[in-house]
Amino acid sequence: TDSIDDMRGGSRALAQLHNILEKYPLPSDIEVESLHEKAQRKCAQIVKLKNYILRRSKTNAFEHLFYECYERFLEQGKKSAEILCELENSKTLVPTYCHGAFNQHNVVYTQSGRWLPVNFETMHPGYPETDLAEYMRKMLEKNHWDTAVADAILDSYCSVRSLDDTSMRLLQALLLFPEKFCKLCNHYSNSRKSWVCDRDVDKLAQLIQLSGEREEYLLHAIV
């Protein structure tokens, strides 16, 4: 969606959902997945793909593009993992239930004029900031990482559910992580290398093309 009003509505609906979910404490025996360990695993996958490409005598179109850009994405991933580790070690993060896949496809506008989250199959114990980061990332990718879009989403969320300094730092670290690049790398790593999907090549080329806009946003958003 490109409508600011729609994005604001989705963001408010997410905040309302988080307000409800945090009323239900997690059982003491439930383990919450480590965010920094997850980020480190994804960084390791980038390095693994890089090493695979280095061993090849001839690279294809995807591998050529990957090798052009992997260093800066890997650097972002490592920095994100470092911040996530710092936050998790501080013991200040409060886990609760999360939607798990909150994007424009999982929030609907009802006939009564309300925005409601749907499709809760992916709900899991975690940190609510991960839902907000996923929603912001999806919307920013569709809007050239426009700071006005980011501000609109964040302001709408905070009008319903406030974020303290720790939550903001977590959100920033999650947005810093090169999630889309890792997703493309993982898809390629699990595919047949003898046949390169043109769609993957196009997606990576587009990601590189838009990386300047993303980095400009991160420059002002990450403190």
Model regions and ranges:
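ATP-binding pocket architecture of kinase catalytic cores
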Residues: T1-D29
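Hydrophobic packing residues in well-ordered alpha-helices of helical domains and bundles
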Residues: M7-G10, A39, F66, Y70, ...
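Active-site activation/catalytic loop segments of kinase-like enzymes and analogous catalytic loops
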Residues: E129-S162, L175-S194
